[in-house]
């Protein structure tokens, strides 16, 4: 999150970073803290879909409407993103291809190939109902 904030500092955006463990309830607590700020956010970008669902659940408890009052996005595009209401905007990660690539590298390492390399996999945004300006 720190590198992303540094990258967009020149855009004069008002960004606030909030850390949470991989827990919907802790994400809900982080969401509640963000809603106490003088300048409330218009969008919450969560590092994974589980945290985003925790934020949506907390918004509901606080009578904050998603997406009318705030947009919430996740990252992963796991099944829960299509089950939660409203459906969750997210970034699709090709988990199957990621696993295949990792297994292939492990097999090469086991065979003595120490030429570790970085593998880039394409992701894409999945626009859903949790965005205020959902197409």
Where are these regions (language model features)?
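Bacterial carbohydrate/catabolite-sensing allosteric modules
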Residues: 1-135
């Amino acid at each position: 999150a720190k590198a992303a904030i540094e990258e967009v500092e020149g855009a004069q955006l008002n960004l606030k970073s909030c850390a949470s463990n991989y827990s919907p309830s802790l994400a809900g607590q982080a969401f509640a803290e963000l809603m106490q700020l003088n300048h409330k956010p218009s969008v919450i970008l969560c590092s994974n879909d589980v945290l985003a669902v925790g934020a949506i659940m907390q918004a509901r408890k606080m009578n904050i409407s998603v997406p009318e009052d705030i947009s919430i996005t996740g990252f992963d595009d796991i099944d829960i993103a299509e089950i939660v209401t409203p459906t969750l905007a997210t970034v699709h990660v090709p988990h199957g291809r990621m696993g295949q690539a990792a297994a292939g590298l492990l097999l090469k390492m086991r065979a003595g190939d120490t030429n570790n390399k970085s593998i880039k996999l394409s992701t894409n945004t999945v626009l859903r109902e949790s965005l205020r300006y959902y197409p």
